[in-house]
Amino acid sequence: VGQCGDGLQVLRAVRQSRPDVVVLDITMPGLNGLDICRDLSRKCKFASVLILSMHDNEQFIARALEHGASGYLLKGAAAAQLTEAVAAVARGDLYLGPGISRSVLERLSNGEEDPYDRLTSRERQVLQLIAEGRTNRAIADELGLAVKTVDTHRMRLMRKLNIHDQTTLVKFALKKGLVSLQ
């Protein structure tokens, strides 16, 4: 059992401790839970992911499942439900908490493409840090990159998303749940 303060710590901790189940929130600093989930499903197949989130929104739920989550439970669920969810995910079962709608599964089956999915992992990291209000210099320092490289990632992700200004970029990140207003 472990606890991490941000998304980058989660990736390091999972690689070191090799847990069977990782319980993640979607809204996390540094790297959001959806991107962590995607990375874990590709690089740490030994760990199943259960998303425990306040986001009761079919878009978030569908994206979590698309990114490799094995379960999704809303915060505020009873302790027994959390125990049941962890056990189900540990067995390799899919777990969706009560009230998670059929429309989520329908959305998954119709294959809608999300422009966010076209971004590289690094572009997603840069987008999240921009949305958190970091400057190019601060992003460069945090990710160990040159400022010019951060600027290049910013330009590429804006082009891929067809976004032309900072305000719209931050709105996009909020809508995707990369950051919250709290």
Model-derived regions: residue spans:
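Receiver (REC) domain active-site loop signature in two-component systems and cognate sites
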Residues: 28
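Short, flexible helix-to-coil linker/hinge segments that flank and couple to helix-turn-helix
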Residues: 59-66, 70-127, 167, 178-181
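Conserved phosphotransfer cores of two-component systems
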Residues: 15-17, 39-46, 67, 176
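Acidic catalytic/metal-coordinating carboxylates
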Residues: 6-9, 32-35
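Active-site residues of response regulator receiver
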Residues: 25, 53
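Active-site beta3 strand of CheY-like receiver
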Residues: 17-23
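Short hydrophobic/Thr-rich beta-strand motif most characteristic of the beta2 strand and flanking loop
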Residues: 1-5, 13, 163
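Recognition helix of helix-turn-helix DNA-binding domains
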Residues: 135-168
